[in-house]
Structure formats: C-alpha cells, structure tokens
Amino acid sequence: MTEVLDILRKYSEVADKRIMECISDITPDTLLKASEHLITAGGKKIRPSLALLSCEAVGGNPEDAAGVAAAIELIHTFSLIHDDIMDDDEMRRGEPSVHVIWGEPMAILAGDVLFSKAFEAVIRNGDSERVKDALAVVVDSCVKICEGQALDMGFEERLDVTEDEYMEMIYKKTAALIAAATKAGAIMGGASEREVEALEDYGKFIGLAFQIHDDYLDVVSDEESLGKPVGSDIAEGKMTLMVVKALEEASEEDRERLISILGSGDEGSVAEAIEIFERYGATQYAHEVALDYVRMAKERLEILEDSDARDALMRIADFVLEREH
C-alpha cells in the first residue's frame, strides 16, 4: 500500500502544479482561498494520477495529459464542495467544509469557478484533435455526475431500488469521472481505439469497485479508520448495494425492521442493521462484487505492453480494495 501511495504522490504533483497555475489568478482573495481549500487539504489524488498513468501506459508523455489530469481533479473538487452543501456535511478531508468556513453562497461560487477552470486546464493544451476528443470526454463526465447525484437523491424516497438502478447511479456519480480520467489520459497519449476502450473500461470498473468498497467499509471498518461512526450510511438512510441486497432477500419481518432503521439517525440500531446484512449475505455479496470489478479492470490492462505505468495501474486496482478509508 505504501508503494501505491508513493506512486500517487509522484504523479499527483504533476497535476497539482497545473491546477495551481490555473487557479492562481482567481480574484478576489476570498474566492481564491475558498476555491483552493480542499485542493490543499490533501486527498489521495487517485483520479489525476490515473489520467497521467494512462497516458504513459500507451506510450505517451505524462506531461501531455497534465491539463486533463488537472481538469479531472478540479471537477472532483467542485463536486465535493457542492455535495457537502447538499448533504450539510461539515467536515471533508479532516478539515471544515468550504461552506462551513465561508458560507454557502461563497462555497457555491468556489465550486462554480473550479468547474469553469477545469475546462481552461484542458484547452491550455491547444486545439489539436486529441485535446478536442479529451475535452468531449470531460464534458460528458460532468453531465453524468449531475445525473448520478439526481438519481441518488431520488433513491432517498424509495425502497424498491433495484441492483441495476443502484449500479447505474454509482457509475454516473462516481465511476464516470474515473473512467473519464483514464480515457482522456489515454487519448492524450495517442492510444489506439482499442487501448482507449480498454482504459475507459478499466477506469469504470475500478470506479464501481471503489464506491462499493466504500459502502462495505462503512459496516466492517472502525470509527478511527473511517473518521466517522461505523454504519453512518445506514443511520443517514443512504442506498447501498448491501441495503438493496438485504431488502431483496430478507424475510418480511427483517425487511420491515431494516426499513425502520434506515435513515432513523439512531446509531444504536445500526448494529442490528449490520446483523441483517450478515444474515442474508449482503455484506459478503458487496465485497465479492467489488472483487469481480477489480479482476475485470486488471484483465482490461492485458492488451497494453508491459511497462512501469501499466504495473502501477495494476497496483492501483488492488489498492482500491486494500484501503481502509
């Protein structure tokens, strides 16, 4: 795991440099500070690193994908700022959320300006066909993120969400941006159509595994590792693969009990919900689905020539399920 973190640190520095070049001219100073708050707060920077590694894995120069990598991270940060407002989350990456420090109006503006700067980051690479194609990928991912968020919000009022609907939601909300990172990075590296498709699939599959593993950690990890109470997704009534599976498989009595616990905010009942997950194999099922997606992601890399970048992508796929938060 340490080796993967070193890889991410090395490649994220390239993206961070381009990000700071793009946002340094934001005025007034209050908006600049609000905009850079989460960017400088840390995070693993998996998405921009994947863009750079995908470029390198097809024989390109990672620097050629720096604009795309920066754009992907700017879009991710914009989405986090707005998510925190919508969910009224007060902490992010161990720091107070942007809206907590600067208020909601300024936080909305910070998200908006980062969203705008993302496109500036891409077009700084010129107007070649590669840049145009990569820009189209980035634009499409932004639409999907909004669609995914809307689906997620709609699920809060439903108890009949199917597994297919859930997978569509997490693909759009989480995996689409990761797939955009790997696809756009490959395009900037001059990849063949077959390589672009393979790397897009790789990003999609590890993105799906990433979100499912997040849901899984919420019930099997501990508060210290998570940085939040175990089962907080259950207390908040969030729809996860485990909830979908348990509601589908449970007896009428257990189903009604689980429904009464979801979104109740009662942390004392969370353990009971987790027991219901275990009873019907929902927890193990989620873990196995995530494992399958990682396996499929690694298989898609087999068409690439052996290289350090390809090896790093393989390691990152495994890292998705090795992380504890």
Swiss-Prot record:
Its EC number is 2.5.1.-. Pfam families: polyprenyl_synt. Mg(2+) 2 binds at residues 83, 87. Belongs to the FPP/GGPP synthase family. One of its GO terms (cellular component) is cytoplasm. One of its GO terms (molecular function) is metal ion binding. Its main location: cytoplasm. This is Short chain isoprenyl diphosphate synthase. Homodimer. Keywords: Cytoplasm, Magnesium, Metal-binding, Transferase. Binds 2 Mg(2+) ions per subunit. Mg(2+) 1 binds at residues 83, 87. The gene is idsA. It is found in: Cytoplasm. An all-trans-polyprenyl diphosphate binds at residues 92, 173-174, 211, 228, 238. The keyword Metal-binding applies. SUPFAM superfamilies: Terpenoid synthases. It comes from Methanothermobacter marburgensis (strain ATCC BAA-927 / DSM 2133 / JCM 14651 / NBRC 100331 / OCM 82 / Marburg) (Methanobacterium thermoautotrophicum). Isopentenyl diphosphate binds at residues 44, 47, 76, 93. PROSITE patterns: POLYPRENYL_SYNTHASE_1, POLYPRENYL_SYNTHASE_2. Its cofactor is Mg(2+). GO terms for biological process: isoprenoid biosynthetic process.
